[in-house]
Curated annotation (Swiss-Prot):
Cited Gene3D superfamilies: 2.20.25.160, Zn peptidases
Biological source species: Xenopus tropicalis
Family that this chain belongs to: Belongs to the AspA/AstE family. Aspartoacylase subfamily.
Name listed for the protein in its UniProt record: N-acyl-aromatic-L-amino acid amidohydrolase (carboxylate-forming)
Chain's gene name: acy3
Xref: InterPro entries: AspA/AstE_fam, Aspartoacylase, AstE_AspA_cat, Aste_AspA_hybrid_dom
Keyword annotations: Cell membrane, Cytoplasm, Hydrolase, Membrane, Metal-binding, Zinc
Positions of transmembrane segments: none
Cofactor: record remark: Binds 1 zinc ion per subunit.
Statement: the UniProt record of this protein carries the keyword Membrane: yes
Topology in the lipid bilayer: Peripheral membrane protein
Cofactor: Zn(2+)
Subunit: Homotetramer.
Molecular function, one GO term: metal ion binding
Its EC number(s): 3.5.1.114
Length: 310
């Protein structure tokens, strides 16, 4: 029998929208909750709301100078700063000054994102965060919507440490919902995200009030590598995502399956040695990062029971 994980009660929760200024579900919800946060009140806490990148939101772009969600490295946050720094570096330091240092008083971060890929409901969690895994399991069982199936995608901690906004919290989840075009708010996606946030707050409140959550088993996806598009000698893309791969996020891709198609009609096949599970397939925001899809492996894990520490 696995040991029970004990964690301190959750006192400070922040719901973040607009980390990317053109991911509209979180933008719309954050703006609404900043005007009327009553929906975020629970018996044991009231969640705060943060509009993370307001200038990017105003311009309806992902970011101004650099990706805010890659701007929370120790190096950037600890730098003295200057007028020539990027807007996002300055904004990351502002957020850090308000909620930092990392993983201290801020107990839980819920960061709201959209993707143009067919990712359904994806819970992005840091590897080893059993508390967040319990939250994801609660959402999978209590907040079901067949139109947006749930998946858990674990984030590796880079060698230099966390760079994501959600790393400000001791525990965290990024809700990644799609497909949804950039700069567009879809009612079905927004409604789904709103329900997930409310259900997340219910879980945190139940935990604070002493509810014990039993151990469970679940499937998780872990990143193997990032695959670029085929490119010519000038660095230009010379093939697109194959129609048989498009929208097949989280489905198995076997050696010999088509992944790209050249403009002359030639298929490019997956030549790996083992089955993988592609995610973020043809994500619009990843073209600049030279990522056509992210290859993952699916593993099964046992998560120990959870209860509040007295």
């Amino acid at each position: 029998m696995s040991p029970t994980v004990q964690c301190g009660a959750v006192s400070q929760v922040v719901v973040v929208g607009g980390t990317h200024g053109n991911e509209m579900s979180g933008v719309c919800l954050a703006k609404h909750w900043l005007q009327d946060p009553s929906e975020l009140h629970r018996k044991s806490f009231t969640a705060e709301v943060l509009l993370a990148n307001p200038i990017a939101v105003e311009r309806c772009v992902r970011y101004i100078d650099r990706d805010l969600n890659r701007s929370f490295s120790h190096e950037l946050l600890s730098a003295s700063g200057s007028e020539s720094d990027s807007y996002e570096a300055k904004r990351a330091r502002e957020i850090y000054q308000k909620y930092g240092p990392k993983q201290s008083s801020l107990n839980f971060v819920i960061d709201l994102h959209n993707t143009t890929s067919n990712m359904g409901t994806t819970f992005l969690l840091f590897k080893g965060d059993n508390f967040a895994l319990h939250l994801a399991n609660y959402l999978q069982t209590k907040c079901v919507d067949p139109s947006f199936p749930c998946h858990i995608l674990l984030i590796d901690i880079p060698e230099g440490g966390h760079v994501h906004l959600q790393s400000m919290g001791k525990h965290s989840v990024s809700l990644e919902l799609g497909p949804q075009p950039q700069g567009v708010a879809r009612a079905d996606v927004l409604t789904r995200m709103r329900a997930l946030v409310n259900c997340s707050l219910d879980f945190l409140d139940l935990f604070n009030q002493g509810t014990e959550f039993p151990s469970f088993e679940t499937d998780v996806h872990q990143v193997l590598y990032r695959a670029d598009f085929p490119r010519n000698e000038d660095g230009e893309i010379e093939a697109v995502i194959h129609s048989e791969l498009q929208d097949k996020d989280y489905l198995p891709l076997k050696p010999g399956d088509p992944i790209f198609q050249r403009l002359n009609g030639e298929d490019i096949l997956y030549n790996g040695e083992k089955q993988i599970y592609p995610v973020f397939i043809n994500e619009a925001a990843y073209y600049e990062k030279k990522v056509a899809f992210i290859a993952t492996e699916k593993t099964h894990c046992l998560v120990p029971a959870l209860k509040v520490q007295n």
